């Protein structure tokens, strides 16, 4: 956009904006812009002053450099164009609730998110991965946000490792060894205090919002019951993964590493363990496709892991803690539907059809158990 066309472009934009009526936010897609002059810069400055929620997206590197060098990136929202990656369907490594993972190169993988996933959700995952890394948790190095066709993706280093699920499948005789490592990973994480004022979110607040979001699928009575359970969990400041099933732990040498960091938060360990139990023991959906091993193995590894996690406690106390964890899992079995608006309708219906049996018919028991949550101090 040089001086010869800037005036004409400004006139066209102004005439279009007049037809729009009240404008709350204005976004300029600059994907076709290869050059911008001082007149073009002044035009964007005028737009940013006229529309407080003004942003420019898909800016090519050379143009972004101009915006950056002139200080415009400090006074308005300007986003670089994302690097485009192409993937081979045959390079698929795994699939989770909100994305599919592919090998991108000899050194990297890319997690491709479902259609409908927002840039904010993608940025949150890469931010949480970096925050957990800084706090001392073993995680893959995260590189960049990319595009794969029309979808967003995250590029990570390729770990020369196997998922914990794969290790258990291949060596079930080492179940106790793997369970101990799994428990150590939880304990390592739950010993980390998350400092106030950082970017890691409050897991309790997020879980409450997720349950309230279910009002589109469940009636008010059902939502209130789930809220009653969740809001009974004590507050906490410990680092939580919130989706640490065995397919989200990678065995690299003798060390387990965390992947899939989109739900990282802080709070009470009961939230984290309840989420994991809902995947490892009571998952709805295709268990082997999601967890990566038979349900029988999942139950075995959970029972052994929780015994190691609470090592030194009496069998009665471990059973009590497991009952508390199971109560929280009854909510997570359904609240995870809020992670995406594009889950298959058949899966949504399966969840709804199981709700009465799993939750409503056990209402009194679940509420009674939730009243004991306060005895779990950290």
Residue ranges with predicted function:
Residues 316, 331-378:
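ATP/Mg2+ or Mg2+-diphosphate-binding catalytic cores
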């Amino acid at each position: 956009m040089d001086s010869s066309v800037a005036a004409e472009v400004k006139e066209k934009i102004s005439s279009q904006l007049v037809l729009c009526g009240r404008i709350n936010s204005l976004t300029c897609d600059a994907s076709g812009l290869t050059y911008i002059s001082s007149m073009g810069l002044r035009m964007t400055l005028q737009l940013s002053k006229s529309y407080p929620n003004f942003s420019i997206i898909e800016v090519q590197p050379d143009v972004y450099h101009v915006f950056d060098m002139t200080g415009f990136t400090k006074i308005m929202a300007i986003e670089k164009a994302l690097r485009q990656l192409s993937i081979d369907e045959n390079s698929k490594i795994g699939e989770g609730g909100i994305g599919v993972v592919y090998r991108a190169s000899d050194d990297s993988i890319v997690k491709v998110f479902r259609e409908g996933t927002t840039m904010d959700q993608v940025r949150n995952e890469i931010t949480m991965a970096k925050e957990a890394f800084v706090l001392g948790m073993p995680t893959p190095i995260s590189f960049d946000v990319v595009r794969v066709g029309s979808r967003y993706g995250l590029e990570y280093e390729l770990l020369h490792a196997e998922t914990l699920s794969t290790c258990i499948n291949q060596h079930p005789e080492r179940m106790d060894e793997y369970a101990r490592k799994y428990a150590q990973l939880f304990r390592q994480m739950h010993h980390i205090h998350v400092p106030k004022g950082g970017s890691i979110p409050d897991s309790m607040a997020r879980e409450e919002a997720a349950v309230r979001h279910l009002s589109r699928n469940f009636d008010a009575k059902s939502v209130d019951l789930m809220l009653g359970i969740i809001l009974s969990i004590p507050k906490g400041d410990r680092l939580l993964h919130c989706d640490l099933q065995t397919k989200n732990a990678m065995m690299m040498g003798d060390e387990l590493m965390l992947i899939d960091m989109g739900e990282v938060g802080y709070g009470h360990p009961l939230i984290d363990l309840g989420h994991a139990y809902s995947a490892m023991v009571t998952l709805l959906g295709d268990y082997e496709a999601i967890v990566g091993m038979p349900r029988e193995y999942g139950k075995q590894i959970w029972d052994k892991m929780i015994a190691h996690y609470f090592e030194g406690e009496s069998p009665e106390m471990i059973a009590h803690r497991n009952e508390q964890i199971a109560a929280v899992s009854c909510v997570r079995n359904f609240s995870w539907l809020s992670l995406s608006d594009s889950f298959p309708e058949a899966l949504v219906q399966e969840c709804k059809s199981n709700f009465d049996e799993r939750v409503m018919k056990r209402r009194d028991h679940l509420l009674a158990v939730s009243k004991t949550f306060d005895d779990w101090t950290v």
